[in-house]
Amino acid sequence: MFLEDMVEYQRDRVTFGVFQKLVVKLYKALVFNLSNKKEKLEWQLLLIADCLRIIGLCRLAYRMASKVHTSTSSVKNKFWSTHVSGMVLQYSGDMIGAEKAFLKSQEFACELSLSFSLQHLGKLNVEVGNYKLAEQQFIEALAIREKLKRADLVESTNRAIRGLQKLRT
């Protein structure tokens, strides 16, 4: 997939803010690396990988997330590295690989993280036209988010459900 196609495909947009965030995360990664704060460094690397995904540097983003996954001992970073890998694969058009990564991430998920995995699986299933499964995944994510009283995330999931309903009409 060419860079222009990838950028068109993404819901996230390349803006100055993305580059600004990337520079800040690179700086923080350097600071955490120099101060031997491994888990914080890994987290910054995942945020950097997400910025790289948005910019369209998906191979680099995938390698970075995979490297964190293989080197971390943090369950949280295992989840997020696998989840970021799934997002990168989805945004580069590898829906099968993305689905596998999102499902794999659930092995490392706490309840809240599981809701992110379910919501992203739902988005993936909307994109491939599997609306019934997408709706089930959105409803599961919504139930978790309501139970945890995460109003900001509940709204995000409700927006996804409304978008799916709009597609069906």
Predicted regions and their residues:
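Eukaryotic all-alpha helical interaction scaffolds
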Residues: 29-33, 52, 65, 69-72, ...
